[in-house]
Amino acid sequence: MNFMKRAGFVLTCATMLANLCAAQNTERTPQGMKCTTQGMDIRVEFYSPSIVRVYKTPEGKPYNKESLVVVKSPETVKVDFSEEAGQTVLKSSILKVLVNPATGGISFHTIAGNELLKDKDYGTSFADKNDAGTPSYQVRGSFLLDKDEPIYGVGQVMDGKFNRRNSMHHMQNENMFTYSPYFMSPVKGYAVYWDNYSISEFMDTPQELAFQSLGHCADYYFMYGGNADGIIAQVRDLTGHSPMLPLWTYGFFQSKERYHTQEESLNVLKKYRELQIPIDCMIQDWRYWPEYQKTDSAWNSHSFDPERFPNPKKWADEIHKLNAKLMIVAWPGFGTHTEQRKELNAKGMIINFDTWPPQSGARPYDVYNPEARDIYWKYLNKGIFSYIGNDGWWLDSTEPDHINRQESDYDLPTHLGSYRSVKNAYSLMHNNGIASHQKALSKDKRVVILTRSGFIGQQRYGCNTWSSDVTSTWDMLEKQIPAALNYTLMGIPNWNSDIGGFFAGRWNQEGGAKNPKYQELYVRWMQFGTFCPMMRSHGTELPREIWNFGKRGEWCFDAQEKMINLRYRLLPYIYSTSWDVSHNDG
């Protein structure tokens, strides 16, 4: 008995000594605190009364990180500082944060004391990693959630699931899969954004939720909003507000892969006007540029084929005279004979892997380099924007496409490090380049971008993400709904899909657009698209203009016309909601 008492006394003393040493290693800062424990330097800082940044680095190895996503500067927040049961307690007017300086664990609570989330004791690790010859780390951060707590976010994932509990995701942005290391818990009213752009892993198991990434630090933001709307307001406060888009962007868009000539595009618009069916925008897909013996050496040259588009300025003007807008596609990769490729290559601003189209030799530019973004815009502006006066951009393949892929491709250098370390932010930076340059040049047109990929924060660039090249099936239509919801719950409000699905060739053997089975799918997809932020008909392998499905008086034509007209009757509601999203972060 005496032995047990002595052992208990020794254990108690040891615990008290450990806590005392930890407390002595804790330093208060103006917005929070910092400490060193478990081989890590930890800094906890309030960015606002409801946003907390947690920043961890290996002990004695500080890293000055500049975020590509976070635009908010820390507010001056009154933080109360105290000790409670060996833990450091930080309080704002909204949140209470407990930091265990012995274990590195951090728990987040409402000011009333209700626990929201726990950054796990001993849950952060740094394992040495060679990143293309540069010393780095495999960083892992682990969190504890309630057993039955649902979470959402993570990105656009085509798996048909909404709740992201008990799932694992290899977070690498590709066609149809658009990830961001973020999740929200609307039931408890909080969200976490893990500020990392590398190819990463998301893992939620009964034991823990974890992010695992390549990097020099564990850097995340805890946001409390009370409910889903409140959370999204916090996300936009941190990563940028969504600008209000023009009224015309909420009308009907017609597109296909592709209109081969300026006359074909213009005639489609004229026919819609003759039928008195509302339409606001025509979209021009790829290969309007010169085609040299079909080799794609002029791929994405930001110029027009003189035979098929002999007078692009007149073409754009005619579209405008018909009271419609013009959106035109641009890609991040360049063919071998383009002036952009030559200039960027001479300056070491090409990422040397194969991108679309196959066997073309096209390569993507180093979007992480601000000078490369300047060069990209220089040609885009001269060849298209200031020349024909288009109204919007369709930025395709913004992941970007990666074909003939080799593992060594991810070691390729960019302006900000290895491609592997920043890959998932490619779309964010590409859209940044277009939006910021257009805004600097022109105050007359708001930036409007349709883009195939995305990352949290991209909402600030006037972007509308579409779900990529999805197949024309009922199963894929069903998957659009949870994919859209999880994507927009990251604070990115504008999302859409190709009405009818992009790849529709399977229906050609049975009549194509006249096939009753395809017509039913297309009409159902259009009904879904009517209530999406952008209503856009697009696809390949069979035409999608309304008259290809029949004529007025036939059910498929009439059903589409009914939905298009409904869209326009809803415009007062849609535009008012757009204002709420922009002005109130609704």
Each language-model region and where it sits:
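Bacterial Sec-dependent N-terminal signal peptides
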Residues: 1-25
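Glycine-rich, histidine-containing beta strand-loop boundary motifs that form or position
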Residues: 46, 56, 92, 99-101, ...
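A low-complexity, Ser/Thr/Gly/Pro-enriched, surface-exposed linker/loop concept
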Residues: 30, 45-88, 126-128
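Short, acidic/polar
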Residues: 261-271, 373-382
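Glycan-recognition and catalytic regions of carbohydrate-active enzymes
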Residues: 164, 543-546, 550-586
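Conserved structural-core and active-site-/substrate-pathway-adjacent residues in large, well-folded domains
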Residues: 44, 94, 182-183, 272, ...
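Aromatic- and carboxylate-enriched substrate-binding clefts and catalytic-loop regions
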Residues: 278-560
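Catalytic and substrate-binding clefts that recognize carbohydrates or anionic sugar/phosphate headgroups
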Residues: 83-246, 256-257, 262-263, 269-274
